[in-house]
Structures are given as C-alpha cells and as structure tokens.
C-alpha cells in the first residue's frame, strides 16, 4: 500500500497555515476570556464591541478609550493565563463585527482562494425545520481554515502534522482516535459568556465508515474489508484555533482566535502573538479586495429529482443479487435488517465549492457542510446526526422511513399518513430506535436513557422522514469520544444486529464506503461534540494516488472532476430487489441535482 505520508503529506505541503506577520497592521481590541467554571454562554453583551468599519478605523475613533480598552483586555488575558498556569490552558481572544457586508460563503472565500482545493478548511451551515413543514436558516454558521495541527489515519498508520513547528511524525497505533483524545486531556479552555453557543474552535473533520474497525478489531478487521479503490484516509481531523462564527439572528460575526499558552515562553509573548494573529484573521475578512463570487442563475426546478445515474460500482443485476443474498440471511435468522449501498459516479466541470453552493439551494438540510480534507473534498447536506454530546447529554436521532414530498400541502398530508401506516417502514424505524437506545445506553448513566420523541414526521426539500430522538446522560468517567465510538456507524446505515450486518456488508459490497455513512463535524475544545451522519454527501477525491481529474474544458479555468454519490437501501424480509435498486437510484439522482444546478449556474454560462 502506498504511504499516506509520501502520497499526500510531503513536508513541502506543510505551509498550509500562513505565517503571522511580525507586526500587526493596526492595534485591534482583543477580548480575552476571564470567566472560569461552567459555561453559561448567555446573550450578555457587556464588553462585546461590534464595529461596522475596518478594524483600523475603530482604533483611532477615540485614542484614550481605545487605549484603556486595550489595557483592560491585556489585564484580563493575564488573569486568565494565571488561572491556567501549568495546565496547558487555552484562552480565546475575539472581536465581534457586523455581518451585513459578509456571508458565510464569501467569508470562506476570503480565507481560501478559489484555486486552492487542498488547504484543510470547513464551512458549516444549517437549515432547521419549523412548524408546518417550514424551514428557517439555523442561527449559527461556522467557517475555518488552516488548522494548526492535523491528525490523519489510514488503517492503523497515523500521520500527525504540527504546522506551527513544521513537524511531521508518523505512528502505528491500535486506535488512532486516542491521539486527538489524549491531546484534549491536557487542555483546559477558559469558559466565557460572551461567545456564541456553538462550535468556536477545536477539531473538525471526518470519520469514515471503516472507523468501526478500530472498535470491532476481530469481527471487522481491515484485512476483511472490501477493495479500497480510492485510498482515502479513514480519519482526518484538523485542529482549528481560528474560527469565524456567524450569528444569523443578530447579524454579526465573531472572529475568534484561541491562544495556547503552552506554545509561548511568557504570557506577554502569548498575548502579543494572539493579538497579532487575531488582527491577521480580521484583515482577511475586512480585506478591501474581497473575492467576487459568481452570481449564477437558477434555471432548474430545484424540487424535482434529477435523471438516473448510470455508472455504479455494481450493475443493477449485481445489486439485486446482493439484495437476494441479504434476504436469505434474514430468513435464516442471521440478521433482521441490513443496509446495502452502491457508489454512483458523475463527471462534472463544476468545482466542488460550486456544487456546495448549488446543494444549499437544491437540498437545504440541518447539517450543511463543505469540508476540504486530505485526499478529498466533502460536500454534504445531511438530515441526521450521528451523535451529539453537549454538557454531558448524549443525543441520537434515528431517521428512517422515507416518502417523497407532495406537490401541495394536501398531498404532503396524504403522504405523511401513508408513511405512518406503512408497516414495513414503521417496523424498520422501531428496530433502529432500539439500536439507538442500545448505542446510547453503552455510555450513559444507568436509568438515564429515554426516547424523547417517537415517530415524528420531518419534512425536507424533496422527501419526508420518520424521526425519533433518544437521549442519555454521559457516564461520569467517559468522554464524548466514547459516545462516538459507541454510535459509529449508526444502525440506519448498517443494520441489526449491527456487527453481524456489517460483516455481511463486507461480503456483499464491492468497495469500501469511505466517508459515506461515517460522520463529519466538530469536537469543541471543551469536549462538546456534534457529528453529522455522512449521508447525502458527495465525495470528490483529490489524493495524488487516485487521479480524478481527467480532462479540461478550458485549460485556463475548468477541469473535469469525478463526483462520487453513494446511496443505500434498508433490506428486510419482504424487500423487493427492484424497489431497493430504484431507491438507491432515486437517492443518488436527488443529490446529483445539485451538480445539474452547479453546471447550469456556473459552467454553462461561460
């Protein structure tokens, strides 16, 4: 197997994180965390300054006031550093600016140029379900680029890149997830009220479906996995200490830099370096030469399904045969249910970020994500969380049972009743709720697991699903990483019993799933975790070991990308092979609609 380090992480590529200038362009008032203890994160605004202009302007409005504010920030920073002395403490510095001139998409382009498809970076957005099937933009959007550190695992080989030190190390370990976990055990981030109640910094990346092999080493070894034809990492995590958080309700942006005191000889050095880095981050979003985004033109009926995709890792007959084999195992009592997937391929001249911009229109979902990782770019519109841990509370939300949306409200209501009266889909959903209760129960305090919501209907742009919510209180001696290990992968993408179903998936599917049906999201410095299930996720491979760019439309601008769209269907005793094949095709075609729109909006007009 080709070395991951050699193929993707050569030392020359360590310069992903830009150097901090020796002196900042102008002094900017930086807020340092001062409140230790429990995180309340209320909306208290005392001390949070919002500036409409460039940061330089605010520094000269009132010289004496600015000087007093700067001195107060310095004092608070030193107090926070003193409390964290000897503990590897993390102290946030931030500035709050109004966002009426900036959007999350444009902010991402301010941090990552259009021609840079390799720098690890992310953009998280959300569309939440409102009453009567309405949708609302989620309150917070998050943007980050140039992680200070990366942890990348391929099977049991781990590459750790420290961009601050320019150092690459490699290890062979039993469980790569122990590496970021052990790093976090030495961190004690200062908790404050003024920062938003969202992800503000920490680990961001993805965990592939094959991550389960670190947990089930005997029954699901890597040696027994299907063919690995893309050579993608099994885990990629970037440590982001620079993050932009958009408050879409109050129309402001928190520009945040976390200072790691352990990286500095003195507190004064830490303060000055943090202020300089915050100024650098501010200068990017206040840049007078803000990148221009192509406006695009929406010419498609975005709620329609696209045309079927013809190229797949399995022919139609091969997939139907796999369904029949799975049914034989069900009839024999080996399993109750199994999810069999196949990977479709679509070539396009639209680049991944354009596809993401289109996906936001075609399929808005609670967990929208654009993630540039080592070896691939993920464009996701996930409706479902894999696991969430917030202040010790674990949430698992099985989403299973699907029907298309109607054209009118009356048709929607009819479809909803039809879905809830479908015995097959309801039985499948209850089975997955039981799996969710089992996953949460593994890491929860005795007696704390409960089903908060059972068989609710959630409406999305193209379909509606049956949804339930399972919760539990995380056991005192465990961490969010344990909750992730217990859940990954969830039953909605594997089957029941889970491990036996995955053993059969290894036999019946022809290629490794990679990011599909794994998870992507973030783990905050304080240990809170939100990992979305990697469904409705388009994977663009970028690793040099797997060339996905075959030809050029315009040698100056356009190259052809290969988009991988994977979809699966839940197989039970009375499943029809034809119906399950059609379900896979429909799911992939709905996702491919974003590529249709991206081509129509951004490519065809050139």
Swiss-Prot record:
EC number per UniProt: 4.1.3.27
Induction of its expression: By chitin oligosaccharide elicitor and the phytopathogenic fungus Bipolaris oryzae.
Keywords: Amino-acid biosynthesis, Aromatic amino acid biosynthesis, Chloroplast, Lyase, Plastid, Transit peptide, Tryptophan biosynthesis
Location of this chain's protein in the cell: Plastid, Chloroplast
Gene Ontology terms: cellular component: anthranilate synthase complex; chloroplast
Subunit structure: Heterotetramer consisting of two non-identical subunits: a beta subunit and a large alpha subunit.
Protein name according to UniProt: Anthranilate synthase alpha subunit 2, chloroplastic
Organism expressing this protein natively: Oryza sativa subsp. japonica
High-level lineage: Eukaryota, Viridiplantae, Streptophyta, Embryophyta, Tracheophyta
Gene: ASA2
């Amino acid at each position: 197997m080709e070395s991951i380090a050699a193929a993707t992480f050569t030392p020359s590529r360590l310069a992903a994180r830009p150097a901090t200038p020796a002196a900042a362009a102008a002094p900017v008032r930086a807020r340092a965390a001062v409140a230790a203890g429990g995180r309340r994160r209320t909306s208290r605004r005392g001390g949070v300054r919002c500036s409409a202009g460039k940061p330089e302007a605010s520094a000269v409005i009132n010289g004496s006031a600015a000087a007093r504010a700067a001195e107060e920030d310095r004092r608070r920073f030193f107090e926070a550093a003193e409390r964290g002395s000897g503990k590897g403490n993390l102290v946030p510095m931030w500035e709050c600016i109004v966002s009426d001139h900036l959007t999350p998409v444009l902010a991402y382009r301010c941090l990552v140029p259009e021609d840079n498809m390799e720098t690890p970076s992310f953009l998280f957005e959300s569309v939440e379900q409102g009453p009567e099937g309405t949708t609302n933009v989620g309150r917070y959007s998050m943007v980050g680029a140039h992680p200070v550190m990366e942890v990348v695992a391929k099977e049991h080989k781990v590459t750790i890149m420290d961009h601050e030190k320019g150092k690459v190390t490699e290890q062979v370990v039993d469980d790569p997830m122990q590496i970021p976990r052990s790093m976090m055990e030495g961190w004690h981030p200062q908790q404050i009220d003024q920062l938003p109640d969202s992800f503000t910094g920490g680990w961001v990346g993805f965990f592939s479906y094959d991550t389960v092999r670190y947990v089930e080493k005997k029954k699901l070894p890597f040696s027994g996995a299907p063919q690995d034809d893309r050579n993608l990492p099994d885990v990629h995590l970037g440590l982001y200490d620079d993050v932009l958080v958009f408050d879409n309700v109050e129309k402001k942006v928190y520009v945040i830099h976390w200072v790691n005191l352990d990286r500095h000889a003195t507190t004064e050095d830490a303060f000055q370096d943090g202020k300089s880095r915050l100024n650098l981050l501010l200068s990017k979003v206040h840049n007078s030469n803000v990148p221009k985004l192509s406006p695009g033109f929406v010419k498609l009926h975005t709620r329609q399904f696209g045309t079927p995709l013809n190229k797949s890792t399995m022919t139609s007959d091969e997939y139907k045969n796999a369904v029949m084999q799975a049914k034989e195992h069900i009839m024999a009592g080996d399993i109750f249910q199994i999810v069999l997937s196949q990977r479709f391929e679509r070539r396009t001249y639209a680049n991944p970020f354009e596809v993401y911009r289109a996906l936001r229109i075609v399929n808005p979902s609670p967990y929208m994500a654009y993630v540039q990782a080592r070896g691939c770019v993920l464009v996701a519109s996930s409706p479902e969380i894999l696991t969430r841990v917030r202040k010790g509370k674990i949430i698992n939300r099985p989403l299973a049972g699907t029907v298309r949306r109607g054209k009118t409200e009356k048709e929607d209501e009819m479809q909803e009743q039809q879905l809830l009266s479908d015995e097959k889909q309801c039985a499948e959903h209850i089975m997955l709720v039981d799996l969710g209760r089992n996953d949460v129960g593994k890491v929860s305090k005795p007696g704390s697991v409960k089903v908060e919501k059972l068989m609710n209907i959630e409406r999305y742009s193209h379909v509606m699903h049956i949804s339930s919510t399972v919760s539990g209180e995380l056991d005192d001696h465990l961490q969010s990483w344990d909750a992730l290990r217990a859940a990954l992968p969830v039953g909605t993408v594997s089957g029941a019993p889970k491990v036996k179903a995955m053993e059969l998936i290894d036999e019946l599917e022809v290629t490794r799933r990679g990011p599909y049906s794994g998870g992507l999201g973030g783990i905050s410095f304080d240990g809170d975790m939100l990992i979305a299930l990697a469904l409705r996720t388009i994977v663009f491979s970028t690793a040099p070991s797997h060339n996905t760019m075959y030809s050029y439309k315009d040698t100056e601008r356009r190259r052809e990308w290969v988009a991988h769209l994977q979809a699966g269907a839940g197989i039970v005793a009375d499943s029809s092979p034809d119906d399950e094949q059609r379900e896979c095709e429909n799911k992939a075609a709905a996702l491919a609609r974003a590529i249709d729109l991206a081509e129509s909006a951004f490519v065809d007009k050139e």
